[in-house]
Amino acid sequence: MDILVIGIAGGSGSGKSTITQWLAKRFGDDVTVIRHDDYYKEQHDKTYAERVKQNYDCPEAFDTALLAEHLMKLRAGESIECPVYDYTIHDRSDKVTLIKPTPVLIIDGILVLQDERLRNMMDIKIPVIYRYINPIFILISIKLPPVLMASLFSTACGKPG
């Protein structure tokens, strides 16, 4: 299965989740979104007080090797069990989410473009810089109707599926 992998990165509050939701809505059932946050490393060995003080905005906080492995499996047509991060306990939960391959896969996170392994598996890389988000969405919504936007995406990236 050919999978279009889109990486969307930017600081907290930059608008990356807004862009991710916008793209996911346009692709409909053909898209799966994976959040890099779900790949924070397990911290069962630390107390809650220690976990609260943890710096979560650095590469060492993430199990990026597992995310890279999962991307390879999805690109190979295999399903994965994605970890689920629980913000209330500042740790991974015991739950996992079964994710099946879809024609479009969006990876959303603050540092998804930082890791070379991940970048090399992405077909499209979108670094989000906050000050450009609102003007871009205003122009897109004024200038490009959704049908034309989908057509442009298909032309630029190849038709999913």
What residues fall within each predicted segment?
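Phosphate-binding P-loop
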Residues: 1-3
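P-loop (Walker A) phosphate-binding loop of NTP-binding proteins
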Residues: 11
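Conserved lysine of the Walker
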Residues: 16
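Hydrophobic positions on the alpha1 helix immediately C-terminal to the Walker A/P-loop
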Residues: 19, 23
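Conserved nucleotide-sensing/catalytic segment adjacent to the nucleotide-binding pocket
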Residues: 28, 32-35, 41-89
